[in-house]
Amino acid sequence: MMAKFNHVPVELPELKTVTVERKRFYVTPEEKYYPSITTVLSIRNKEGLTEWRKRVGNDVANYVSGKAAARGTKVHHMCEDYLNNMESEWPDKWKEHEKNFLPWCLFGQLKSKVLGNISDIHAQECGLYSDKYKVAGRVDCIAKYNGVLSIIDFK
């Protein structure tokens, strides 16, 4: 049986983005500038990645990183399309995903273990911000996960 996800209409403000000194900031409706969560996390020590890059060399590191990023993007699109009911509403388009073997297998694991716990999708690919923490970012999905309204990020 194919899943059919319910989408709950909500209105969230669009957040503009600006880049200052190679750092992304989101502009709230109140004109506050908050750094993206990615910008905040990029400040953290990347010692492990740096050591790996030194060990394998730039060419290998760039190749592996590029392949992993492309695979992650494909899995992300599969999750998004699945939650948008593409499997049942546009089966021919959905079949295209099956041609990407490894991403399809990874998606299958997410589908069976994670995506089935999602219901009542409120938003996808939207900007969120916190006045309390003074940070912002884009979220993959806001929905109920096991009955609890949650922010969901596909990684």
Regions found by a protein language model. Give the residues of each.
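Metal-dependent nuclease catalytic cores that hydrolyze phosphodiester bonds in DNA/RNA
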Residues: 1-136
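Conserved catalytic cores of phosphodiester-cleaving nucleases, focusing on short active-site segments
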Residues: 76, 137-155
